[in-house]
């Protein structure tokens, strides 16, 4: 029996990637960023930096956008002050197309306490009036009917340590393959709990 001294020391942070059961009609994978020892969500600057590396890696160089549908005035003002490109959509939705790494990190750090969306795929290159109207009215529930038109749609809750990806094509193993290179610079253990 190995003693505690014989066990390998795990990195301070873990990214757990696992399939989620959201019903027969919905395929989803959850990503949970936690402190390894406490199992609590990772928050703060380190979390923002890790998520800012994970998001572009998930997209595999496909077009992507962030969708904000609450506290729009604060998001709009932040984007304006930090010269982050954005567009107004459907009244109560603000779309931020592919912010560069430093700006993404700032955005994620500032709005970590918010729930927002992440869309990826060829269709993210152009406005999606139907989805953006749905986001304005129903929030991220609108992704349920739309995610099949995209490589994935993600529900992002950084302060809770969660991103839930709705996708017909991405499995947990593919997500791990995509994010592993991006996480090499961080001390993060990637796990696939069963």
Where are these regions (language model features)?
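Structured alpha/beta or helical-core interaction and ligand-binding surfaces enriched in interleaved
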Residues: 1-194
């Amino acid at each position: 029996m190995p003693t505690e001294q014989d066990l390998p020391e795990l990195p301070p942070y873990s990214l757990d990637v696992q399939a989620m059961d959201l019903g027969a009609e919905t395929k989803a994978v959850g990503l949970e960023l936690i402190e390894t020892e406490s199992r609590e969500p990772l928050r703060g600057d380190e979390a923002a930096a890790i998520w800012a590396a994970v998001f572009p890696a998930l997209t595999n160089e496909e077009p992507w956008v962030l969708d904000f549908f609450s506290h729009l005035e604060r998001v709009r003002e932040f984007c304006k002050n930090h010269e982050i490109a954005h567009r107004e959509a459907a009244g109560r939705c603000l779309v931020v197309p592919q912010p560069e790494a430093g700006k993404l990190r700032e955005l994620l750090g500032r709005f970590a306490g918010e729930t927002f969306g992440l869309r990826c795929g060829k269709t993210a290159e152009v406005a999606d009036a139907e989805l953006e109207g749905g986001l304005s009215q129903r929030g991220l529930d609108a992704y349920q009917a739309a995610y099949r038109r995209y490589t994935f749609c993600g529900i992002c809750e950084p302060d809770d340590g969660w991103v839930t990806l709705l996708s017909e094509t991405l499995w947990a193993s593919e997500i791990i393959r995509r994010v592993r290179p991006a996480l090499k610079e961080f001390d993060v253990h990637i796990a696939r709990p069963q």
